[in-house]
């Protein structure tokens, strides 16, 4: 999770987030190189007394500044498209979790099991236990198994919401009347926090998301207790 004075992203806890971090570094390096080149050219123009006011045609220069941007765009577009297809690809998920956004809480339903659904509200400050995080703790955490492909079905009962867990690289809009889907898979156990990322009313900032990812053995034990 994020911590005070943090610079950069949270630690990646899913293959998708790892790919997004690599893509961010890749794109940032390209931006850095372009910025350095532009600053170098500007410094040369300001420091030299020579000017080319009589230049009427420069075919080589025009060719370079046409081809080079095209190559740069291709270098950005190809890995971006690869990640885009990875995020949309859902092959034989192990289970499905349906999420509905409300003003101002989330409700969850494990569609593979009968009568396993609950609402998840933020725990108010007076009710926090020692060690709980203010404005991030909920009364009912989502328990899921690690290292398994999970299909998320996300929608809303009222207004626009957005179900977001940064460490897992997930941000999917919850739209009334529309069912969006996303893939969730973690590489390690842990507790991951998120929040609604679409302004949805006066209590928009009080819609935390808490996922508790556990090994399959412990998930099955929790499942038996909940059913």
From Swiss-Prot:
Cofactor details (free text): Binds a dinuclear copper A center per subunit.
Q: What is the species of this protein?
A: Nycticebus coucang (Slow loris)
UniProt lists the family membership as follows: Belongs to the cytochrome c oxidase subunit 2 family.
A biological-process GO annotation: ATP synthesis coupled electron transport
Q: Which residues lie on this side of the membrane: Mitochondrial matrix?
A: 46-59
Mitochondrial intermembrane topological segments: 1-14, 88-227
Q: Where does Cu cation A1 bind?
A: 161, 196, 200, 207
Q: Which CDD domains match?
A: CcO_II_C
Chain coiled-coil ranges:
none
Cell compartment(s), UniProt: Mitochondrion inner membrane
Q: Which of this chain's residues are annotated to bind Mg(2+)? A: 198
- State the name under which the record lists this protein: Cytochrome c oxidase subunit 2
- Residues modified as Phosphotyrosine are 218
EC annotation from Swiss-Prot or TrEMBL: 7.1.1.9
Residues annotated as signal peptide: none
Stretches that traverse the bilayer: 15-45, 60-87
């Amino acid at each position: 999770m994020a911590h005070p004075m943090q610079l950069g992203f949270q630690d990646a806890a899913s293959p998708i987030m790892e790919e997004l971090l690599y893509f961010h570094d890749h794109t940032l390096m390209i931006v850095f190189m372009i910025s350095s080149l532009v600053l170098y050219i500007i410094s040369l123009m300001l420091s030299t007394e020579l000017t080319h006011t009589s230049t009427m045609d420069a075919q080589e220069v025009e060719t370079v500044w046409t081809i080079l941007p095209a190559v740069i765009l291709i270098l950005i577009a190809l890995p971006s498209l690869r990640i885009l297809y990875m995020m949309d690809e859902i092959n034989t998920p192990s289970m499905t979790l349906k999420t509905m956004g409300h003003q101002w809480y989330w409700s969850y339903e494990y569609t593979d099991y009968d009568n396993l659904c609950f609402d998840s509200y933020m725990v108010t400050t007076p009710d926090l236990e020692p060690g709980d995080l203010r404005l991030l703790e909920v009364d009912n955490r989502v328990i899921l198994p690690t290292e398994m492909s999970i299909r998320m079905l996300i929608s809303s009962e009222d207004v626009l919401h957005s179900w977001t867990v940064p460490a897992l690289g997930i941000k999917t809009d919850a739209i009334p009347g529309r069912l969006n889907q996303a893939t969730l898979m973690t590489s390690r156990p842990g507790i991951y926090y998120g929040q609604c990322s679409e302004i949805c009313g006066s209590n928009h900032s009080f819609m935390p998301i808490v996922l508790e990812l556990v090994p399959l053995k412990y998930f099955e034990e929790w499942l038996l207790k909940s059913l």
